[in-house]
């Protein structure tokens, strides 16, 4: 699944995808973090997921580094990449991570790996 995410198509062919595996005691730490996020933000899915992940042998995390792709496409809401406010993600980064997750999920389905 990590390989599928890593090799998925990317905007401009630039790989800024990050993957990691969480195992062992780190799963409990992640669960504790999700519970703290529930306390801070009040969103119940954090609490649900905090309990659900304790059943897993491992957890695959997929994300992206934030890096403007220099296309000045405007999909982020700004006319140019240089005009983008700090903290506003490049839309291509979001698209890339979505494609990477889709590729990883397709591999999971092929292997009959469920949630």
Regions found by a protein language model. Name each.
Residues 1-115:
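Acidic, surface-exposed loops and disordered segments
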């Amino acid at each position: 699944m990590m390989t599928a995410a890593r090799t998925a198509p990317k905007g401009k062919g630039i790989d800024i995808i990050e993957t990691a595996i969480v195992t062992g005691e780190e799963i409990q730490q992640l669960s504790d973090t999700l519970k703290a996020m529930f306390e801070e933000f009040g969103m119940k899915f954090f609490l649900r997921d905090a309990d659900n992940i304790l059943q897993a042998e491992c957890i695959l995390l997929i994300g992206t580094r934030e890096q403007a792709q220099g296309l000045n496409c405007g999909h982020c809401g700004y006319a140019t990449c240089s005009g983008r406010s700090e903290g506003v993600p490049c839309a291509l980064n979001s698209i890339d991570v979505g494609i990477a997750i889709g590729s990883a999920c397709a591999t999971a389905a092929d292997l009959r790996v469920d949630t």
